[in-house]
C-alpha cells in the first residue's frame, strides 16, 4: 500500500502537468529504455528509502519518541529530515586553519540562504517527514513509510526522464515547480492531501507501545 500510495500521488502531479500542457511525454525514449530506467529508478528508490527510513524514522524519531511526545518527536525529526536535503556539499579546503570547521559549516548551510530556492520545497519535505513519522507511530514498523518514501523518490528520479518541459512557466512556476518536482505548491498540496488520507486511514488503529527499526518497539 505504501509504495502504491507514494507512486500514485506524484504520478497525479505528473499527469496534471501533462494535461495542462506544462510538460509533454518524452517520446525520444524507446519502451525498452523506459522500462530499464523504471527498474533502475525503483531499485535506487528502495535502497535510498531503506537507508533514510532506518536513520530518520528508525533511529532519530524512535529515539526522540522514547523521551518525548509524538508531536515533539515528529516535528523534530521531520525538521531535521527537511533541512538535511538543503545542505550543500562544500569542496575540500586547500588548507586547514582554526576557522575551517565554521567555514565548511557555513558553506553547507548556504543552500538555506535564498528563501525562493527553499520554499515550498522545505515545507513539502517537512510534510513528508511528518507523515512518515505518523505511519511509523501508528504501525509500529517502517514498512509503510518505507513504501511511501520509495514511491516518492521514484518520481523525483523519473519526472524529467518521462517528461520534458513544454511551456515557459514564468510566474506559474511557483505552482508547478521546476524539474525537481518537490519545489512546487502543487506537489505540496498533493502531499498534504495524501497525508490527510493516511492519517484518517490509520487514525483508529491502536497505537503500538514500542517498536524496533523494522518491527515493534522493544
Predicted regions and their residues:
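Functionally important transmembrane alpha-helices
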Residues: 74-78, 82-83, 100-102, 107-175
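C-terminal membrane module of polytopic membrane proteins
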Residues: 150-218
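Hydrophobic alpha-helical transmembrane segments
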Residues: 40-51, 108-128, 180-193
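Membrane-interface helix/loop boundary segments of multi-pass membrane proteins
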Residues: 51-83, 87-100, 134-141
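Interfacial transmembrane-helix boundary/kink motif in multi-pass membrane proteins
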Residues: 1-15, 28-38, 62-78, 179-188, ...
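Transmembrane alpha-helical segments in integral membrane proteins
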Residues: 47, 51-64, 126-151, 190-205
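Membrane-helix interface motif
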Residues: 18-23, 87-98, 160-166
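Alpha-helical transmembrane segments of multipass membrane proteins
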Residues: 5, 9-13, 77, 81-88, ...
Amino acid at each position: 500500500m505504501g509504495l502504491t500510495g507514494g507512486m500514485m500521488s506524484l504520478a497525479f502531479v505528473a499527469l496534471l502537468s501533462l494535461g495542462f500542457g506544462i510538460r509533454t511525454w518524452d517520446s525520444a525514449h524507446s519502451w525498452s529504455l523506459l522500462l530499464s530506467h523504471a527498474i533502475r529508478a525503483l531499485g535506487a528508490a528502495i535502497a535510498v528509502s531503506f537507508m533514510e527510513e532506518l536513520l530518520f524514522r528508525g533511529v532519530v524519531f524512535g529515539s526522540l519518541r522514547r523521551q518525548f511526545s509524538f508531536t515533539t518527536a515528529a516535528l523534530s525529526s521531520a525538521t531535521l529530515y527537511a533541512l538535511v536535503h538543503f545542505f550543500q556539499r562544500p569542496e575540500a579546503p586547500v588548507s586547514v586553519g582554526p576557522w575551517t570547521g565554521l567555514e565548511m559549516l557555513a558553506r553547507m548551510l548556504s543552500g538555506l540562504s535564498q528563501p525562493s530556492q527553499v520554499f515550498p520545497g522545505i515545507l513539502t519535505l517537512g510534510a513528508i517527514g511528518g507523515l512518515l513519522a505518523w505511519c511509523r507511530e501508528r504501525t509500529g514498523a517502517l514498512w509503510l513509510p518505507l513504501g511511501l518514501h520509495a514511491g516518492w523518490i521514484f518520481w523525483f528520479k523519473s519526472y524529467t526522464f518521462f517528461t520534458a518541459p513544454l511551456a515557459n512557466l514564468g510566474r506559474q512556476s511557483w505552482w508547478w515547480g521546476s524539474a525537481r518536482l518537490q519545489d512546487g505548491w502543487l506537489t505540496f498540496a498533493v502531499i498534504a492531501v495524501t497525508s490527510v488520507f493516511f492519517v484518517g486511514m490509520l487514525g483508529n488503529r491502536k497505537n503500538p507501545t514500542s517498536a524496533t527499526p523494522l518491527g515493534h518497539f522493544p
